[in-house]
């Protein structure tokens, strides 16, 4: 009888041990399932988040500049006087990108901003006075070229040595361009991309070089910047289909 009671106790202990073991297994399995579901969810979110970028990159990679011919927009050449502050005359030998800026001078036109660059020639040879741009686009969409494309401009910091710079006028502090300014910018950038076979990903904002809020509207509204680059791609593809 004592032996039977001992056997019963042993069985109960074994049963409790098995229950605890089963409970641990179930807990581990539950945690593993939850982790797996979380990983799958994160994967789906990541794919959804980056797929537009992949699509955009694919569109860019499809461009064949040998089949594209973008006509030169109407440009008024009003080159700056050579000087140490705004037109040093340093050769720009390898053009790999285009940098978009805004003037940060609301309501002014292309001529006024060009003349501001010109006025730097009378300033001391100091860093604070070194400023210019290859092109300025006015509120009315007119384009003034201040510096030849084969010379550097003092506009984009460390990217001065390999990029073309474009300053855009804007009517107010928001930095948003007028429709005419925007259309001229799309045309000019498309023309430069075609001429120098520049990838769309190398059409950048001043912000992308220095983190400066320039061009303000495109920095504050990155979706508008993406749309702008898409408009360039669309413009180039349209010209490709016309050839």
Write out the residue ranges for each language-model feature.
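Solvent-exposed, acidic/flexible segments
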Residues: 93, 128, 159, 174-182
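Basic/polar, cationic surfaces and motifs that engage anionic cell-wall
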Residues: 19, 25, 46-74, 172-243
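Metal-dependent polysaccharide deacetylase catalytic core of the NodB/CE4 family, i.e.
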Residues: 153, 168-173
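Short coil-to-beta-strand
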Residues: 157-165
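N-terminal catalytic cores of peptidoglycan-degrading enzymes
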Residues: 2-156
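Soluble periplasmic/extracytoplasmic beta-strand elements of cell-envelope proteins
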Residues: 99, 136, 165-167, 204
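Generic recognition of cysteine residues
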Residues: 123, 146, 168-169, 193, ...
């Amino acid at each position: 009888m004592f032996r039977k009671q001992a056997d019963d106790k042993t069985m109960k202990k074994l049963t409790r041990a098995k229950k605890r073991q089963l409970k641990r297994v179930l807990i581990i399995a539950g945690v593993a399932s939850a982790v797996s579901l979380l990983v799958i969810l994160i994967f789906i979110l990541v794919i959804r988040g980056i797929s537009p970028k992949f699509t955009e990159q694919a569109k860019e990679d499809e461009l064949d500049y040998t089949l594209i011919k973008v006509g030169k927009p109407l440009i008024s050449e009003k080159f700056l006087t050579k000087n140490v502050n705004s037109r040093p005359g340093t050769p720009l030998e390898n053009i790999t990108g285009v940098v978009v800026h805004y003037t940060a001078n609301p309501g002014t036109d292309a001529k006024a901003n060009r003349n501001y660059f010109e006025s730097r020639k009378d300033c001391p040879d100091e860093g604070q006075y070194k400023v210019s741009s290859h092109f300025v686009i006015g509120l009315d969409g007119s384009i003034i070229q201040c510096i030849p494309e084969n010379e550097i401009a003092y506009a984009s910091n460390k990217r001065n040595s390999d990029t073309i710079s474009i300053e855009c006028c804007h009517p107010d502090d928001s930095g948003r361009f007028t429709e005419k300014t925007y259309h001229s910018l799309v045309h000019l950038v498309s023309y430069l991309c075609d001429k120098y076979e520049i990838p769309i990903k190398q059409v950048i904002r001043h912000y992308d070089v220095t983190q400066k809020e320039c061009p303000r509207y495109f920095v504050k509204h990155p979706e508008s910047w993406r749309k702008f680059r898409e408009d360039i791609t669309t413009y180039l593809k349209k010209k490709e289909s016309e050839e």
